[in-house]
Curated annotation (Swiss-Prot):
Species name: Streptococcus gordonii (strain Challis / ATCC 35105 / BCRC 15272 / CH1 / DL1 / V288)
Disulfide bonding pattern of the chain: none
Name used for this protein in its record: Methionyl-tRNA formyltransferase
Gene designation per UniProt: fmt
Residues the entry annotates as binding (6S)-5,6,7,8-tetrahydrofolate: 110-113
MF annotations from Gene Ontology: methionyl-tRNA formyltransferase activity
Catalytic activity of the protein: L-methionyl-tRNA(fMet) + (6R)-10-formyltetrahydrofolate = N-formyl-L-methionyl-tRNA(fMet) + (6S)-5,6,7,8-tetrahydrofolate + H(+)
Family stated for the protein in its record: Belongs to the Fmt family.
Annotated keywords: Protein biosynthesis, Transferase
Database matches in HAMAP family: Formyl_trans (MF_00182)
The protein's role, per its UniProt record: Attaches a formyl group to the free amino group of methionyl-tRNA(fMet). The formyl group appears to play a dual role in the initiator identity of N-formylmethionyl-tRNA by promoting its recognition by IF2 and preventing the misappropriation of this tRNA by the elongation apparatus.
CC per GO annotation: cytosol
């Protein structure tokens, strides 16, 4: 039985961890995840999804603020593990740790070499990719630059957003790792180097990238909105305050960018640089997330055709 250390943080990682724990080929000796964080206005302490799984299985848990040079790293190196599996861990692994293991592999939510970085699912949607997938690769010091062990793709539909793709790709990643790892460890798979000419980067979304520019086409804005749903959420301005848009649909229409073209009982049509969008799910400042009909019956009841979103 192969002895592993698992490193990961979000729900995506937790799905893969469960797959390894349910397999009879691997023994997970310990889990390494990010420290507990205070979140929200009430600053409530929240543990990571990976920690939740580890606690339910009674696994040893390490949560270093920084792995390099930490007492936790020394303890990890002395566990006698054969290797490490990382999935959206959120920290670089020190060279000293990489050198100690027989293997270190990473599960990455893109079809490498495209979309290296921390937000591959977001950018696959924002850039209008027709497909995405998961790559299993060898871990090296450079971010997401290791040789590729295996890849598996899935189509992206107009109904997808970050949330749906996270769920789909977590299952793909779990299954691909379980399908691939035995052959890789036995030497039956020869990893393939990434083509440097095809490398693109998808770093974490910056706050300024969340704002909608109504001069863009309806397709570009549609992709931005779903590429940030359910987080960090695209927004515009309404009455000088932030107005979040979770969901929209493509539509025909012509007017000044950001102009309201039509108001119905359950519909709000807004012009873009080319075409229009029907807003479906929104969140005005200081209000909860709501359907467009609830908005039009409440905070937005005084909206009029010709009013504009944005600056």
């Amino acid at each position: 039985m192969t002895k592993l250390i698992f490193m990961g943080t979000p729900d995506f990682s937790a799905t893969v961890l469960k797959g390894l724990l349910e397999s009879d080929q691997y023994e997970v000796l310990a889990v390494v995840t990010q420290p507990d964080r205070a979140v929200g206005r009430k600053k409530e302490i929240r543990i990571t999804p990976v920690k939740e799984v580890a606690l339910s299985y009674g696994l040893p848990i390490y949560q270093p603020e920084k792995l390099s040079g930490s007492p936790e790293m020394e303890a990890i190196m002395n566990l006698g593990a054969d290797g490490i599996v990382t999935v959206a861990f959120g920290q670089f692994l020190p060279s000293k740790l990489l050198a100690r293991m027989n293997f270190v592999v990473n599960v990455h939510a893109s079809l490498l070499p495209k979309h290296r970085g921390g937000a591959p699912i977001h950018y696959a949607l924002i850039q209008g990719d027709k497909e995405t997938g998961v790559t299993i690769m060898e871990t090296v010091k450079e971010m997401d630059a290791g040789d590729m062990i295996s890849r598996r793709s899935i189509p992206i539909t107009d109904e997808d957003n970050v949330g749906t793709l996270f769920e789909k790709l977590a299952i793909v990643g779990r299954d691909l790792l379980l399908d691939t790892l035995p052959a890789y460890l036995s030497g039956d798979i020869q990893p393939e180097a990434q083509d440097p000419s095809q490398v693109t980067f998808s770093p974490n979304i910056r706050p300024e990238e969340e704002r909608l520019d109504w001069n863009m086409t309806n397709r570009q804005l549609f992709n931005q909105i779903r590429g940030m749903n359910p987080w960090p959420v695209a927004h515009t301005l309404w009455q000088g305050e932030r107005f979040k848009i979770y969901e929209a649909e493509l539509a025909d229409g012509e007017g000044q960018p950001g102009e309201i073209l039509e108001i119905g009982k359950r519909q709000l049509l807004v012009a873009t640089g080319e075409g229009a969008l029907v807003l479906k799910t929104v969140q005005p400042a200081g209000k909860p997330k709501m359907t467009i009909s609830d908005f039009l019956n409440g905070a937005g009841r005084n909206l009029a055709v010709g009013d504009k979103f944005g600056n």
